[in-house]
Every structure is written in C-alpha cells, then in structure tokens.
C-alpha cells in the first residue's frame, strides 16, 4: 500500500495496525484475526498497482467481528473481484483521481457507499458540516447528523473534467487488460521466478507486471538488464532509499507523529486507558519485507499495439532466459 492510507487513520484519531501480505502483495486474510483487538473498529484493504485484494475472504472476517471495511481503490480504479467492482464490497470505497492514477483529473478523489448515514457524514465533512442539505441552516434531521465539518471538496471545473475522465475508464481498463494478456500469454516460465499471485486475473486492471526472483541480487540484475533493453522495470526494496510504500519506512507513522495541533491518536489517553500501545518494528510483516525487497515491477502502456506486445514479450524472454532456467512446470504468468 501507500503511506496515505495509514495517514488517513491517524487524521481520524485512530491508530493504524499493519497486516502482512501474501504473494498477491495484498492483505493476507489469514493474518487479520490475530491482529484484531477490542479496540479494532475497521479494516482497510488496499488494492495496489492495478491488482485486487481477496475481498470475499476479507469481508468474511469483517462480518465475523462486526468491523467496518474501508476499501482503498486509489491504484486500482476499474478493477473487479468476481465481477463486482472494487469499492463496492466495503462500507466505503475510496478512489483517487490525481494526475498519475488510472483515471486522472487533477487532485483529490471520491468515495462511494450504499450507507445513507455515511453518505450524509461525507457531505457534512466536505461542505461546512451540513450546508449541502436542501434546507441549509435547518436543525439536525436525526440525532448525530450534524458536526463541525470542513470545506474539503474539489472545484466545479475539476469535477466536470473528472466526470468526462470517468466515462473513459472502461475503455482504458480494457486496453490495459488486453495488453497484459497479450504479453503474459507469450512469456516463458522460469524456475527462479514466481509471478505475482492474482486474486482475480480477469478483474485486475493490468497496468503492471510484477514477479519475484528467488534472490534480491537476481532481481537487481534482471531489472537493470530489462531497463538497458528498453523496458521500464525497477525494484523498490534494498535500493538505498526509503520508500513510503512499505510500512517500516512510513516515518510519520512509525515515529508516531501528530496530525494537527493535538496529540490524540497514538498518545490519546482514551487509547491508553483501553490498553492501547503500539510499536512499529522492522520484521512486523516478514512476508512483505521479503517480497518488497525482491519484487520486480514492469510498467505497461495501454496504447501498445499487438506488434508492440510481441516485441515486449520477446525482449523479456531474452533477458529472463539469460539469467534463469526455463521450466514449463513453473508457476505461470497471469
């Protein structure tokens, strides 16, 4: 995921707890329950780099423990899980429309929900605590409706741009999926490489191709060779620079800093009174630590032609065959 998801928890006066991942590089449903305490109020599965979480398993855990679910769909807008769009499983789905996302329209984002009370609260937060209502200055229509909100909202001009951009989303996602399938369908399999596990191969957006060489050093060599051959590949872990896409480098979180003037999140007396105390350490999420250091990320372009895809796959096969051993029985690309 990215730091922003955890930061949103702190801004809401909460304390984020990180869950480890599996080979899909998404929240591992099997590891959620061990992290749940009487203080847990919500799960925040994050759909990353065009792929999707195992939402059915996550929702089962949430229902069993009566927890809210907030889906962070910023990096996978248009993705699906078993035919249903990401963002429609949880209580709230959150999307980003910043310039470098799948659907870009400036800055900011949007949310969706089928809970009318949550929808009212979102509107109160974005427009003065209640000014959006038909009778702007009326008393509360029900207990708890009004609170001191803000004016966190995009401009009318940006909203108009975003409406048009969102209308293009299905075609954009379809192009990415076609490109990735044309490439992965031509890639050979290798003993020393495990492609990322896909929770829904047909539902992912498909703008990245990710795989795990068996060692960090092999990953570094492959990434460099791919770049030298003209393919946009890279690694994020063990490159000598901190990265706010991995929990232990999210310094505003790990250092337990404030959000705003007060100190009511990590150091809240109410949190402490309920037995709350958290420390963030390297090794808290060992699978994430391992995979993040080894994963090679390859970016794809929605405008690749079929000829481009053939050439792309040929170059990848050439590079991978130089470093790895072909093995038809190895894990296939998806």
Feature names for model-found ranges:
Residues 130-140, 182-185, 223-295, 324-334:
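Conserved PLP cofactor-binding pocket of PLP-dependent enzymes
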Residues 36, 59-68, 105, 110-130, ...:
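Basic phosphate/pyrophosphate-binding loop/patch that engages nucleotide-derived ligands
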Residues 20, 297-305:
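Proline-centric
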Residues 216-222, 305-311:
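Short, conserved charged micro-motifs
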Residues 44-46, 96, 196-197, 207-213, ...:
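Short beta-strand segments
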Residues 1-73, 80:
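PLP-dependent aminotransferase-like
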Residues 76-82, 89-208, 215, 242-243:
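Active-site region of PLP-dependent enzymes
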């Amino acid at each position: 995921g990215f730091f922003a998801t955890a930061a949103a928890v702190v801004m809401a006066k909460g304390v984020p707890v990180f869950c480890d991942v599996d080979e899909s590089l998404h929240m591992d449903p099997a590891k959620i329950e061990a992290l749940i305490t009487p203080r847990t109020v919500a799960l925040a599965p994050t759909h990353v780099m065009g792929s999707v979480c195992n939402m059915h398993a996550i929702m089962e855990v949430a229902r069993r423990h009566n927890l809210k679910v907030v889906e962070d769909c910023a990096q996978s807008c248009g993705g699906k899980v078993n035919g249903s769009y990401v963002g429609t499983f949880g209580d709230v789905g959150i999307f980003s429309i910043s310039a470098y996302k799948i659907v870009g329209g400036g800055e900011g984002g949007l949310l969706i929900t089928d809970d009318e009370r949550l929808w009212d609260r979102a509107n109160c937060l974005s427009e003065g605590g209640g000014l959006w209502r038909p009778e702007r200055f009326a008393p509360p229509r029900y207990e708890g409706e009004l609170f001191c909100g803000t004016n966190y909202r995009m401009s009318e001009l940006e909203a108009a741009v975003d409406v048009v951009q969102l209308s293009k989303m299905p075609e954009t996602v379809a192009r990415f999926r076609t490109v990735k399938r044309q490439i992965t369908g031509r890639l050979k399999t290798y003993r020393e490489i495990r492609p990322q596990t896909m929770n829904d191969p047909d539902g992912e957006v498909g703008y990245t191709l990710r795989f795990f060489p068996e060692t960090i050093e092999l990953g570094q060599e492959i990434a460099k060779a791919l770049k030298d051959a003209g393919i946009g590949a890279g690694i994020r872990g063990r490159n000598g620079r901190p990265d706010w896409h991995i929990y232990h480098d999210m310094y505003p979180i790990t250092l337990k800093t404030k959000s705003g003037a007060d100190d009511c999140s990590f150091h809240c007396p109410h949190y402490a009174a309920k037995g709350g105390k958290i420390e963030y350490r390297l090794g808290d999420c060992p699978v994430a630590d391992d995979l993040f250091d080894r994963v090679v990320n390859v970016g794809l372009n929605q405008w690749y032609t079929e000829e481009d895809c053939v050439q792309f796959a040929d170059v990848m096969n050439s590079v991978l065959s130089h470093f790895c051993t072909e093995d038809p029985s190895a894990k296939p690309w998806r």
